[in-house]
């Protein structure tokens, strides 16, 4: 049995009711279909609001990153602490006591091992960090989540920011995840300005997140060779394909997806077909898709928000998959690691690649 790869702990004061809703949002996200392709036990989500003692004012049980687990149980490779910053918790930390010691221990654990322990503040009430003991302890740590609390947009941003932060903490991603925006400027007879409007909307939404962007028209510098620049960027970034009517028929669009898949990079498709495709392409198979819809002639912003969330989920899945592979290499398993570790990427584009490692299990 492999030790857990990622454990997410949602910590909040029982008096801050929004903490329950944040916890439920994260439980649904990390236990849902988005992460169902990982080997069992890769992700666990725990909620820590209640006192660990009979004292109702007491703090929750210590986390494994603070106090070692009994019986030699191994800690997870990555620990993400989601601290819901509400007014009740801020008030409790004003005076010395078990909750202040508990939150201080979380901050100390992050400071001692920031490559494996992350602290992600979710500020659900304004001014909780302003000239408070709470702010002194954790206010210097960049939080997650944007927008009005309890809205769908806020919940989506919390999930996306958390997944991005964990992926970057896993050291399998650059300091900032970069989105390679793949699209075609060739339009069908009925698309007109709709495609450019959608691409602009996607770019605006990326700009409103903590994600970086590679967009060929702006990223490739004058006097640079654009072909190798695009190949290199597609092999290093998380690829978001805006699939319009002519997308699958464009050679360079297929090439960009092919480069990303061969490099093992995440790929997600935003389906924005108006009439449909006259031809398809096998290189676009086996990747998550999100439909883009028009309402009164305007692209729905929520569809773009959803596809960016799915793309970041794929980035985190890639990090966790590789962590599992690294850990499994050092333990005795009843199956050959070469078999299950490569199932994630068994596709024709990889088989045709001369660098693709051959599996020892026959198919």
Predicted feature descriptions by range:
Residues 85-87, 244-245:
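Short glycine-/small-residue-rich Rossmann-like dinucleotide-binding loops
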Residues 122-125, 242, 270-272:
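Generic beta-sheet signal
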Residues 89-91, 247-249:
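Short glycine-rich, flexible loops that bind phosphorylated cofactors or substrates
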Residues 277, 282-284, 290-328:
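Charged, amphipathic alpha-helical linkers/stalks
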Residues 218-220, 245-248:
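Short, acidic/glycine-rich phosphate-metal binding loop used to engage nucleotide
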Residues 126-141, 226, 275-291:
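Glycine-rich, charge-decorated loop segments at or immediately adjacent to ligand/cofactor-binding or catalytic sites
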Residues 1-86, 94-100, 111-115, 127-129, ...:
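Conserved N-terminal substructure of TIR/SEFIR domains
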């Amino acid at each position: 049995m492999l030790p857990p790869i990622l454990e997410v702990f949602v910590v909040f004061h029982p008096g801050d009711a929004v903490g329950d809703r944040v916890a439920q949002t994260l439980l649904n996200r990390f236990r849902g279909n988005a992460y169902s392709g990982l080997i069992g036990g890769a992700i666990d989500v725990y909620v820590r609001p209640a006192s660990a003692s009979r004292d109702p004012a007491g703090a929750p049980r210590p986390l494994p990153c603070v106090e070692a687990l009994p019986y030699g149980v191994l800690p997870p490779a990555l620990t993400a602490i989601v601290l819901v910053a509400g007014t009740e918790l801020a008030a409790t930390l004003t005076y010395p006591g078990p909750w202040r010691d508990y939150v201080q221990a979380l901050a100390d654990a992050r400071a001692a091992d920031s490559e494996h322990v992350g602290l992600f503040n979710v500020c659900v009430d304004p001014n909780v960090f302003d000239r408070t003991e709470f702010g002194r302890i954790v206010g210097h740590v960049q939080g997650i989540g944007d927008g009005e609390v309890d809205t769908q947009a806020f919940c989506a941003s919390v999930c996306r920011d958390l997944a991005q932060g964990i992926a970057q903490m896993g050291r399998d991603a650059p300091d900032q995840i970069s989105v390679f925006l793949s699209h075609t400027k060739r339009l069908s007879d009925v698309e007109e300005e709709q495609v450019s409007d959608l691409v602009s909307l996607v770019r605006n939404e990326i700009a409103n997140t903590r994600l970086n962007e590679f967009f060929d028209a702006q990223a490739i510098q004058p006097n640079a060779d654009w072909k190798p620049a695009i190949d290199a960027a597609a092999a290093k970034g998380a690829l978001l394909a805006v699939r319009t009517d002519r997308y699958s028929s464009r050679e360079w669009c297929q090439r960009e997806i092919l480069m990303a898949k061969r490099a093992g990079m995440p790929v997600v498709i935003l389906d924005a077909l108006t009439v449909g495709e006259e031809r398809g392409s096998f290189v676009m198979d086996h990747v998550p898709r999100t439909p883009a819809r028009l309402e009164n002639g305007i692209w729905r912003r929520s569809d773009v928000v959803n596809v960016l969330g799915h793309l970041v989920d794929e980035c985190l899945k890639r990090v966790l998959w590789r962590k599992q592979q690294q850990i499994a290499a050092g333990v005795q398993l009843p199956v050959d690691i070469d078999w299950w570790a490569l199932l994630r990427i068994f596709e024709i584009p990889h088989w045709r690649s001369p660098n693709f490692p051959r599996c020892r299990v026959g198919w």
